[in-house]
Amino acid sequence: QANQDFMRF
């Protein structure tokens, strides 16, 4: 679930 990691911005 890298989506959440990308939304950390």
UniProtKB/Swiss-Prot annotation:
Its main location: secreted. The keyword Secreted applies. One of its GO terms (biological process) is neuropeptide signaling pathway. GO terms for cellular component: extracellular region. Detected in the thoracic perisympathetic organs in larvae, and the dorsal ganglionic sheath in adults (at protein level). The keyword Secreted applies. The modification Phenylalanine amide is found at F9. Keywords: Amidation, Neuropeptide, Pyrrolidone carboxylic acid, Secreted. It is found in: Secreted. The modification Pyrrolidone carboxylic acid is found at Q1. Belongs to the FARP (FMRFamide related peptide) family. This is FMRFamide-7.
